Swiss-Prot record:
Keywords: Acetylation, Activator, DNA-binding, Metal-binding, Nucleus, Repeat, Transcription, Transcription regulation, Transferase, Ubl conjugation, Ubl conjugation pathway, Zinc, Zinc-finger. Expressed mainly in the thymus. Belongs to the EGR C2H2-type zinc-finger protein family. This is E3 SUMO-protein ligase EGR2. Residues 126-153, 159-178, 185-210, 275-345, 408-470 are annotated as: Disordered. The gene is Egr2. Pfam families: DUF3446 (PF11928), zf-C2H2 (PF00096). Induction: Activated during G0/G1 transition in cultured cells.
Amino acid sequence: MMTAKAVDKIPVTLSGFMHQLPDSLYPVEDLAASSVTIFPNGELGGPFDQMNGVAGDGMINIDMTGEKRPLDLPYPSSFAPISAPRNQTFTYMGKFSIDPQYPGASCYPEGIINIVSAGILQGVTPPASTTASSSVTSASPNPLATGPLGVCTMSQTQPELDHLYSPPPPPPPYSGCTGDLYQDPSAFLSPPSTTSTSSLAYQPPPSYPSPKPAMDPGLIPMIPDYPGFFPSPCQRDPHGAAGPDRKPFPCPLDSLRVPPPLTPLSTIRNFTLGGPGAGVTGPGASGGGEGPRLPGSGSAAVTATPYNPHHLPLRPILRPRKYPNRPSKTPVHERPYPCPAEGCDRRFSRSDELTRHIRIHTGHKPFQCRICMRNFSRSDHLTTHIRTHTGEKPFACDYCGRKFARSDERKRHTKIHLRQKERKSSAPSAPPSAQSSASGPGGSQAGGSLCGNSAIGGPLASCTSRTRTP
């Protein structure tokens, strides 16, 4: 709030506000019996309680007519003019309209700061050396006033004219008011003239609390914890203060690792709704090798989580090879990738085969089923596992039409049909060979040899020979 503190017994000349008045303009004998106080379009109470209204021209309005005429003041009947001796001079009261620097920052619609200059000089002085003196006070609009511009409070006492001003109460913290409204009043007052008989002893105005509370640089405002706008507790500083060495991700990076790939739901839905045999079509079901693959279950859709196998410990294989000494079909010089695990003599011709083999030692299973959350070390194992959930059986037997989910199962089943075929082909050729061996001279010997020398059905042949003999 722009409020100036009045000092005791400080005469101030009006030479800084207007031009010097001629000495012969107002003779002493023509002075009015009482001092004239001029407030255009104003309203004064007994003790100068209130002042409402401001002239729209924004200039200094001072009535200094020298003719003797009754005062035509639009004041209420409760106002009693202050009687003064004849030797008193005029009272010059002016009004200044100053536009604020920032019109939008003020709370008041008029945007005007009033500065009232009032004072009475006591004592008789010659007209030639008499100067119009006054004490300058500045009053700013009080936000607590009921009028449009506020209240200016003044009190007149003894002939010494001790102006006593009580500092106004601090204004409430309005949201629209800013610190730009409360400026130093010394910027609006003109410096004292060097030709005046008295000097201006100006003191800085008292400091009043600003509507904006001062922010301590060492304190940080507490903000409510909204989980939708702030990170998780593991990413927040537990002490609430952000230091210069704060990292963007204080949590361990293991929790931010990309999750392993899952089986697409579209793959599961397609084969579940289509039935167990939906994936089997025409020659693909009866042809050799693998049948049609699941859409999205190939190597393009299922990828392993990136990892470094050198950082994982290599453990020995729990189940060793069934035939460890069996030679490989590929020569050793064509298998340049040996297994680094201790006690494992496997060698591979391609690096991807070695990578897939190392997962056996490390136990890394980057492929996960989306239905049962089971992990697998190889993508083809995951593909065949998904078929247990969907019921897909793309591999059918060529002999009986039985369907299988895996090609090795169908291959194992096909061997059964091959063995049965071999037995059927060998069964019709046995009776002709037996008949040719039995035919010839000496039927009894042939019959004895049939019964006694039968290696396959010896007891059965002896029983039949006994029954045939009389």
